[in-house]
């Protein structure tokens, strides 16, 4: 009772809301039409088809954007589904646009040529370049000399004397420590060696013999003798000049 009297006596204004019928008839929802929800014209038992019929390629060109000028777009409703990414909505009975045709399959030869680089030959036909061999990479010995090799001086190999050759050379060295040219040639032919090998062996054997007998080297002795002779020649003139200086000094004192 108190609540109703307060609302009557107060200046509270009762809001005037339009009835539901007027709101539906003149409002935003009424402008959409009776078939906005897609069930007024077709009935409650309408079932949209599950699969759209696929048209032939002759009916509609590739990449069609929509229906012709004579056809009208149906009203948008909840019972319709979008027809494509371009914003075109197709009715359930309207055929959807044809998907793009797949590109033609290339030929096997053309595919292989396109994948491979034309500048680079295939791996099977790649030409193998020969390895570059420089002169310093070649190992040449005296026994196996390449006649076509025109590089630097060939490297000499160490001669391996047999037991019989060493025995004959030791026997010859016991009688003669120095060989003549004629005797060296004879020994070289007998032992199947070269004159150079015989000469080098005797030089090494003489050095070993001097070392065993503790004899001075002939080269060192010759150098020491030459140095002593030069010293004696330089001292002799100074000794000769000393008496002459004394005589000259006595002459000056007498005057």
UniProtKB/Swiss-Prot annotation:
Keywords: Developmental protein, DNA-binding, Homeobox, Nucleus, Transcription, Transcription regulation. GO terms for cellular component: cell junction; chromatin; nucleoplasm. Sequence-specific transcription factor which is part of a developmental regulatory system that provides cells with specific positional identities on the anterior-posterior axis. Residues 245-255 have a biased composition (Basic and acidic residues). This is Homeobox protein Hox-D4. Its main location: nucleus. GO terms for molecular function: DNA-binding transcription activator activity, RNA polymerase II-specific; DNA-binding transcription factor activity, RNA polymerase II-specific; RNA polymerase II cis-regulatory region sequence-specific DNA binding; RNA polymerase II transcription regulatory region sequence-specific DNA binding; sequence-specific double-stranded DNA binding. It comes from the Eukaryota. Coiled coil: none annotated. A motif (Antp-type hexapeptide) lies at residues 133-138. It is found in: Nucleus.
């Amino acid at each position: 009772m108190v609540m109703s009297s307060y609302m009557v006596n107060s200046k509270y204004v009762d809001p005037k809301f339009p009835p539901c019928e007027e709101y539906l008839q003149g409002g935003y929802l009424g402008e959409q039409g009776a078939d906005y929800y897609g069930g007024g014209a077709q009935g409650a038992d309408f079932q949209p088809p599950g699969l759209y019929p696929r048209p032939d390629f002759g009916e509609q060109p590739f990449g069609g954007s929509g229906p012709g000028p004579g056809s009208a777009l149906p009203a948008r409703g909840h019972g319709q589904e979008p027809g494509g990414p371009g914003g075109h909505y197709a009715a359930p009975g309207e055929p959807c646009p044809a998907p793009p045709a797949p590109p033609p399959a290339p030929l096997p030869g053309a595919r292989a040529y396109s994948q491979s680089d034309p500048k680079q030959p295939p791996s099977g036909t790649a030409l193998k370049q020969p390895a570059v061999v420089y002169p310093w990479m070649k190992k040449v010995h005296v026994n196996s000399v390449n006649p076509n090799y025109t590089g630097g001086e060939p490297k000499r190999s160490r001669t391996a004397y047999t037991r019989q050759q060493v025995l004959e050379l030791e026997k010859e060295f016991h009688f003669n420590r120095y060989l003549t040219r004629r005797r060296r040639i004879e020994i070289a032919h007998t032992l199947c060696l070269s004159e150079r090998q015989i000469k080098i062996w005797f030089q090494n054997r003489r050095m070993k013999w001097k070392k065993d007998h503790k004899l001075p080297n002939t080269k060192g002795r010759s150098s020491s003798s030459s140095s002593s002779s030069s010293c004696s020649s330089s001292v002799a003139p100074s000794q000769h000049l000393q008496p002459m200086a004394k005589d000259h000094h006595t002459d000056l004192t007498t005057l």
